[in-house]
């Protein structure tokens, strides 16, 4: 009987602490997916265009740059 009481009280306590934690952390994670998406877009390797000095064989150069033949035979983004 005592063991059953202790188990019931501990389950109620753990459930209450989980609910309190969930309510507390809800506002902190509201836009987490959008923030991670924006961070991925800003990474240097995730850009859609090649910057000055980068190769332009597999992707186009950024606006204002043109693809010029490089010394190794591949194209390089230059002004």
Curated annotation (Swiss-Prot):
One of its GO terms (cellular component) is extracellular region. Transmembrane segments: none annotated. It holds the Pfam family Conotoxin. The modification 4-hydroxyproline is found at residues 60, 63. It is found in: Secreted. The keyword Ribonucleoprotein does not apply. The keyword rRNA processing does not apply. Keywords: Disulfide bond, Hydroxylation, Ion channel impairing toxin, Knottin, Secreted, Signal, Toxin. Expressed by the venom duct. Residues 1-22 form the signal peptide. One of its GO terms (molecular function) is toxin activity. Disulfide bonds join 49-62, 56-67, 61-77. Residues 23-47 form a propeptide. The presence of a 'disulfide through disulfide knot' structurally defines this protein as a knottin. Belongs to the conotoxin O1 superfamily. Ion channel inhibitor that inhibits the increase in intracellular calcium upon depolarization in DRG neurons. In vivo, both intraperitoneal and intracranial injections into mice induce hyperactivity. This is Conotoxin Tr6.3. It comes from Conus terebra. The lineage of its organism: Eukaryota, Metazoa, Spiralia, Lophotrochozoa, Mollusca.
């Amino acid at each position: 009987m005592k063991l059953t009481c202790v188990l019931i009280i501990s389950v109620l306590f753990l459930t209450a602490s989980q609910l309190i934690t969930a309510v507390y952390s809800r506002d902190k994670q509201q836009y987490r997916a959008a923030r991670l998406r924006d961070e991925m877009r800003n990474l240097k390797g995730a850009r859609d265009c090649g910057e000055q000095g980068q190769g332009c064989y597999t992707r186009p150069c950024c606006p204002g740059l043109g693809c010029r033949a490089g010394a190794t035979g591949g194209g390089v983004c230059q002004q």
